[in-house]
Amino acid sequence: MNEFKSVFKNELTEYLAISQGTISDGTLQNTRRILLSFDSLLAEENAGGISEKTVNRWIGGLLQTNAPKTVSDKVSYLRKFLRYLQYEGYSVFMPDCPKTSDSYVPYIFSDGEIQMLLASADSWVGRHTDPQTRQMDMEFCMLLRMLLGCGFRLGEPLAAKVKDINFSRGTILIRHAKNNKQRIVPMDVTLTGMLEKYCIAMAIKTEPESHLFPSVRKKGAAATKGTFGLRFRKLLQETNLYVPGKAHSRGQCLHCFRHYFAIHSFAQAEKKGRPVNDSVPFLSVYLGHHDMDETEKYLKFSSDMFPEYTELFEDYAASVFMEVGDEEK
């Protein structure tokens, strides 16, 4: 049964079939979800084609419930399908991607707040007696330290398996990073030791195919982002650190730990006298960034908190972009 209902239902189905295998499963699911939304509007209007009016109505609906950046991303998905239709000989309206400015400023936890969060999370392990809950408590405590100690994206350690850890070298292989990249991430000796004890306590150290953070409900699967996201919200509320987020903003979340890591790594390198033009590129590679623009986003912080580091990074970025501009002339 075709899940699409509009006059373009066959083309939509064919487009997804062609896309399968050329993009990740997550991207394919996002594409399907977005195209289903557009297809519903086409079916509702009983449209025989794709006009400017219909496309703008769909975009207008997105703007009411999504952040500008999200709208731009969804329009980009639609544009790819519309290009496919044009290739097939259809005359369709092609919208521009709405221009957005990156206004996202992450919540930066203070050192004191981080210590408070860790202490509270650690107390959960001794508080609960249910085996599954205790397992999740242990996983949560370890995950927090890995995010803080290595600046991982949340999905990276969740996808990792025991075989990806080299305890003697203190490294972890991230096989499935953003943009289908891989990288080997060095860990601090203290974190490596803690991770080894965790694996022994979880009885997974001798199980190379075991996920580092196994699901308590589904055997052989990894714990989900949502599971830890809910636990983090509970932790924030318990420590009275919860701050309601603004509409369409990420707010306080585990991804903020990645920003915390980036900022403090940059600050630590500067305090040790390491030149900025050495530390920033290294940090960019360590975080698995595609370019310096990505790293710049992770060094967004309040100038009131770190005025000296703000100026240092801005000076470095300006010199880099000036050199690039000179080369292009």
Question: Which residues make up each language-model segment?
Answer:
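Conserved catalytic core of the tyrosine transesterase superfamily
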Residues: M1-K329
